[in-house]
Amino acid sequence: MLFKYWVVCLLLFILFIQARASSFMPAVTNYLAKDYEAGYQNWACAQGSNGEMYFGNSQGLLVYDGYRWTLHKVPGNHIVRSVYVKEDRIYVGAFEEFGYFKYSEAGTLRYHSLSKFLKNFPMENNEIWNIVELDGRIYFQSFSAWFSYDGKMVRAL
């Protein structure tokens, strides 16, 4: 008798949970390319400590502050494939180009190329697909090489 009681209670609980779950809608907002006025493809995403969202987009770096979208281009107007945020810098990787964006005193994002400081390494056909941090260094990964940035110097590994 006690077993039947627990089985009935369990079945009622499962039915209740299922009914509640079917009415659950996750808090997701879908944005179309016409909403943010940039390319259709977003390749990477990161969030800054200020709450802003950063997207590697087919037309550059997309920034969403919760109210408006802004697009920031990299040299050559290449696709931004990777994004990594560390403190006040937004590191990006693109085709034959990598570096970081940083807010100026006027509050606008300015791009600083790191790949232009590479000595004796051709960036031809290199695309930065991944950015990671390890032991205080930022590493940029392409299909053929890794690049290390310690805050002062860039070098190919």
Labelled PLM ranges:
Residues 1-157:
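Carboxylate-rich, polar loop motifs that coordinate divalent cations or form catalytic acidic clusters
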